[in-house]
Amino acid sequence: IIFVVGGPGSGKGTQCEKYGYTHLSTGDLLRVDSSNGFLIDGYPRQGEEFERKRLETYYK
């Protein structure tokens, strides 16, 4: 497992694609759930970080 860490729009997905890694984005997962009616407290908004505690609770 390789973690690519960076802020929104920093190129994490681009780097994964460049080197042939599978890109699993927490933000993408939240957006998919949001489209299915599981938007949590107005998150995720573009450029905002999701609080770690909320994320851990949400995906347990």
UniProtKB/Swiss-Prot annotation:
Transmembrane segments: none annotated. GO terms for cellular component: cytoplasm. ATP binds at residues 9-14. Its EC number is 2.7.4.3, 2.7.4.4, 2.7.4.6. It catalyses: a ribonucleoside 5'-phosphate + ATP = a ribonucleoside 5'-diphosphate + ADP; AMP + ATP = 2 ADP; dAMP + ATP = dADP + ADP; dATP + AMP = dADP + ADP. Its main location: cytoplasm. Signal peptide: none annotated. Keywords: ATP-binding, Cytoplasm, Kinase, Nucleotide-binding, Phosphoprotein, Transferase. SUPFAM superfamilies: P-loop containing nucleoside triphosphate hydrolases. The keyword Kinase applies. Coiled coil: none annotated. Its cofactor is Mg(2+). AMP binds at residues 26, 31. The keyword Transmembrane does not apply. Residues 25-53 are annotated as: NMP. Consists of three domains, a large central CORE domain and two small peripheral domains, NMPbind and LID, which undergo movements during catalysis. The LID domain closes over the site of phosphoryl transfer upon ATP binding. Assembling and dissambling the active center during each catalytic cycle provides an effective means to prevent ATP hydrolysis. Catalyzes the reversible transfer of the terminal phosphate group between ATP and AMP. Also displays broad nucleoside diphosphate kinase activity. Plays an important role in cellular energy homeostasis and in adenine nucleotide metabolism. Also catalyzes at a very low rate the synthesis of thiamine triphosphate (ThTP) from thiamine diphosphate (ThDP) and ADP. Belongs to the adenylate kinase family. AK1 subfamily. This is Adenylate kinase isoenzyme 1. It comes from Mesocricetus auratus (Golden hamster). The gene is Ak1.
